[in-house]
Amino acid sequence: MTHLVILPILLPLAAAVACTLMRSSIQAQRRVSLSAALAMIPVAFLLLERASHGGIDIYALGGWRAPFGIVLVLDRLAALMAALCIVLALPALFYAAGGIDAEGRHFHALFQLQVAGLNGAFLTGDLFNLFVFFEVLLLASYGLLSHGNGLSRARAGLTYVVLNLAGSALFLIALGLLYGTLGTLNMADMAEALTRLPAADQALVRTAGAFLVAVFALKAALLPLSFWLPHVYGAACAPVAALFAIMTKVGIYAVLRVSAVTFSAAPFTADLLQPWLMPFAIATIAVGTLGALAARRLGVVVANFIVVSTGTLLAAIAVSSTDAVAAALYYLVHSTLVSAGFFLLADRIAAARGASSDHFASGPPLTNAMALGAGYLTLAIAICGAPPLSGFIGKAMILQSVQGAALAPAAWAAILLSSLLPALVLARTASVFFWEPRPPRAGMLLQLGWPTAAIVLLAAASPLLSVFAAPVAAYARAAAEQLHSPRSYYGAVLGADAEIQRERRP
């Protein structure tokens, strides 16, 4: 048992406690928070390196093995998601250190708490602790969303809190039904229990599974539970919106993990997602694309791109093949980093335009227009999926993987239009921001510093994912193959206990 597995949770938790104790000094909080984020980078690479060998590491808290104790599980998929969260957190903190973090006393504590919750959700091996980590990251996100105050953020925060409280209640109901029927909430142990479940209890488990899927769909912003996202993400301050770019991926990860590890074990739950996931994914792509066309602010356009990415990812996952899941994982990394970078750039453009902000209206000439324009062009090409950047590679992989699916023509049309139509939106936006005649400059002069470094790091992600597309795609394929071979997961988590017949409720 290696302690490396728990470090992505412990380090940000310790940083959150330290920042809370230092709440009177923003400089001290910055040092602690940035130091923790920097210390996590080698941890991310170590997680990927350890998982790349194909083994599955189990961390049993307190020495209590599953299914009786709390376990963290590190496989290729968990390592990829935790590493992505860690890599995303650093530039978001860099941007916040430019001054946004000083608008509230608890920004860094809440930020680190959310990182801990995200990593815990990716690493946990049972559904109850998935719920716990969901609540940790959601509680932190409630505070982060209201950071900086403002009426729009208060309204967005209220919507966000109400929806997620409803989701949490539904999650608890599902857990109660599953525990009452199966006698366990460990994902590997649940799979073993499903194979022995009496026929009389199968309908109850399917109902609980449907509740779980509804909760995960809310987290992922799958239609019809996606209308909250553009309003909420568009209102958040830039570094918070950047970190929120991975929040929807938690729901997608949960769908992947639970369907592949748990529900795939029994015929009556194996098809729980298949009949409806592809139609809803296509509809989500369409709604996100229309939302981007209708938006009047760059930040809201980027938020709608996240909705589009959710639909694109779930369209691939609906196919449920190894190739499709591998394509989805590659595109997931791309879309998360590029969307986060675009949120930061939109805020930078808004600051440079003064009172005009990032609204699609004539404003003063941009200061640092060349640098902002270069970043805008790079991120626009990446987020639309145009060659030669990683968005094109990811979408091409997904299009290839969905061939032969029942709704393949509709999926192809939706994915291709979600690249073409947003490209027109971004071209129109560029003409407003960079080329339209304007009165004399009234925007602020932007200085190079932490925020610029953050944007450069995230803008560089797409070219790097293109250059290193082969090894990233190979890792994604290996993760997909491991996910579709859950027997190794069961053996690693349960060990000899997999063969023990435990008394269960009838």
Regions found by a protein language model. Name each.
Residues 1-11, 74-86, 127-140, 205-218, ...:
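Structural signature of hydrophobic alpha-helical transmembrane segments
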Residues 236, 355-359, 364-374, 426-506:
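Cytoplasmic/organellar membrane-interface segments at the starts of transmembrane helices
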Residues 144, 194, 233, 313-323, ...:
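Interfacial segments of multi-pass membrane proteins
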Residues 1-6, 14-111, 188, 478, ...:
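Transmembrane helix-loop-helix hairpins at membrane boundaries of multipass inner-membrane proteins
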Residues 27, 107-113, 117-204, 292-359:
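Alpha-helical multi-pass transmembrane bundles of energy-transducing inner-membrane proteins
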